């Protein structure tokens, strides 16, 4: 009797429930405006060492999650800049065409010329979301270039899984 019960449990575990975990690759392009908020505090140990707190609004021109186009993203981050390099860490809240949201955490490095950003790279990971993006997980990379007017362009790559 126990053997039949265990076999029945195994068969039930294999039955399709109608909700499947979706996997995919994210490859997109994003353009960010000049930071809306940018608070700078000199550290005082050297003339070029500063800490900043910034927020920037970004628009995606390419990219989707499970067929839902990525529209925009607001990133809030801190930077520790000194010696031509900035170490950055922050969070992003993005909106899909459906209105669902995703949340990310990122950290990276920005190359500076003086105090002006030139290029950057980062690693990011999903930390959650709403609607279809609820329970999303995954990670990836980003590479950015900065323009003289403080706008920036980003190439985003990664992989994700959505919850069943």
Give the location of each predicted region.
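Bacterial N-terminal signal peptides that target proteins for export
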Residues: 1-7
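N-terminal signal peptide c-region/cleavage motif recognized by signal peptidases
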Residues: 15-19
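Beta-strand-enriched cores of mature, soluble protein domains
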Residues: 21-164
């Amino acid at each position: 009797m126990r053997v039949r019960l265990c076999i029945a449990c195994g068969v039930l575990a294999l039955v399709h429930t109608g909700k499947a975990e979706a996997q995919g690759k994210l490859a997109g392009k994003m353009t960010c405006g000049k930071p809306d908020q940018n608070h700078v505090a000199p550290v005082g140990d050297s003339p070029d060492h500063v800490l900043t707190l910034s927020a920037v609004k970004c628009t995606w021109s390419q990219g989707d999650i499970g067929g839902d186009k990525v529209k925009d993203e607001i990133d809030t981050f801190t930077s520790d800049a000194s010696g031509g390099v900035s170490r950055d860490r922050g969070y992003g809240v993005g909106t899909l065409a459906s209105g669902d949201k995703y949340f990310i955490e990122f950290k990276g490095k920005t190359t500076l010329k003086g105090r002006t950003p030139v290029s950057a790279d980062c690693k990011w990971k999903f930390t959650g979301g709403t609607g279809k993006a609820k329970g999303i997980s995954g990670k990836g990379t980003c590479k950015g270039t900065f323009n003289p007017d403080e706008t920036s362009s980003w190439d985003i790559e990664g992989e994700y899984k959505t919850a069943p």
